[in-house]
Design a protein with these regions (language model features):
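Sec-dependent bacterial lipoprotein signal peptides
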Residues: 1-19
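Acidic, Ser/Pro/Thr-rich low-complexity regulatory regions
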Residues: 18-133
Length: 133
């Protein structure tokens, strides 16, 4: 092997290690979510706690493009807190959650816009259904 090929070999090796680390990190987060989401669905864990921990795990995982995912989980933390505090009903929360689940594998800011719009709509509907105080 020539000395010219050595840097290329090292770069390839490091890239392979980085890809493995990223893949392992993503799989670890996905496994955690699959294990804990049923706890939130059954009421054994608050939705806000689930999404806050999910957000923390994603933020601490070395992933190349995690920006839209972090934003989407932030939207879900907000939506779940509104739901738990009665500012959004179950149908509204499920609407936001459904959009997030549908687009969870797409790193697209447009998916986040849909989730934010669903949350705003749920808040508006909730406010309209409550009598003035």
């Amino acid at each position: 092997m020539s000395l010219r090929a050595l840097p290329l070999c090292l770069a390839t090796l490091l890239a392979g290690c980085a890809i493995f680390t990223e893949t392992y990190g993503i799989q670890d987060v996905d496994n955690w979510a699959a294990k804990n989401e049923p706890l939130a669905e059954s009421g054994k864990m608050k939705w806000s706690e689930f999404y806050a921990q999910y957000l923390e795990r994603v933020a601490n995982t070395p992933v190349i493009s995690q920006g839209p995912v972090v934003e989407r989980l932030g939207i879900m933390v907000t939506a779940s807190l509104f739901y738990e505090r009665g500012r959004v009903d179950k149908a509204g929360f499920d609407s936001v959650r459904g959009i997030v689940q549908k687009y969870q594998t797409i790193d697209d800011p447009a998916a986040n816009l849909l989730a934010r719009n669903a949350l705003v709509k749920a808040l508006d509907q909730s406010a309209a259904s409550k009598p003035d105080r």
